[in-house]
């Protein structure tokens, strides 16, 4: 791990402890090797998209090719490790949701509530970074099948900010 573990701030120290603990627990679903937190430049090279970002990368990379992005603030994984095919499906699922959001002029949280209702999942389960290829295909299909005029009217409750 490249980041310093010793720190003055108690909160930051706790975050680092959680990261180290989490890092030990992450295993690749493809080859069962451990995954480690690495600079994104390992995978992407010295590109603008890699600057200051981190990934959890299978320790057998590049042979295995499984990785997942880390949250910028907490450095916890954004989902499960994914190979190239699954990463591509997740990108397509995010694009489908974004298109539905734009077509319906919805907030992001509204789109996710719509998706939760359609998939019968709760908020903790509705993260594309956790989805399999099958679930990503379901998201894409639901978004493509949703008539814009209907899907825009499916969720009309007040926002959590209004409550």
Regions found by a protein language model. Name each.
Residues 21-27, 51-54:
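Short metal-coordination and nucleic-acid-contact micro-motifs, chiefly zinc-binding Cys/His arrays
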Residues 89-104:
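Positively charged, polyanion-binding regions of nucleic-acid-associated proteins
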Residues 118, 122-139:
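Short, compact, well-ordered microdomains
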Residues 155-163:
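Single conserved hydrophobic/aromatic residue that forms the stacking wall/gate
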